[in-house]
Amino acid sequence: MKKEELSRTLLNQAVSLGLCAQWTEQWGEPDQQGLIDKYLHGIDFCIEKGYPTNTFIKEHFDKDILHRNNIFVDEDVQARNMKHIAVLNGNCKGTLLFDGFSTCDIYVRHDSDVTIDCSKFSKVFINVYDRAKTHILQSGAASVYVYIHGEDCIVETDGDVMQRKSQM
């Protein structure tokens, strides 16, 4: 799918799901990186609406660009000190390590099953959705905050981990 088609298809899907007028008017003609930036900036909308689908992401986005932006779908993920935002969609498995002064917002979705190891002075915010399973290890002065969205996800912790259930 060409850049213009991909952007137009995603815009039309988003509008049909209730994208606000401001985002619609400011959409522009983004390339894949621009579309990924929109996805990460509007992650709450995307998660709530199931948009775009995992199949769509896998079929239309370059895996290297997704990985550079810490977005994974149905993959084994072994990473250390990911920055900013990380999104694990579908059936991801793996281990994420955070140490030193690293910070990250992580979204673990669908049927993903990951271990997240936070140590030293890291600060990690973890959102768990759907049927995802997380095992979270905290040590040292690491600050770890877990937000549980739904009744079907599983969160296991070891160490000082703050947990909250989503109000939505």
How would you describe each model-predicted region?
Residues 1-110, 115, 123-168:
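Short, glycine-biased loop/turn motifs at secondary-structure junctions and
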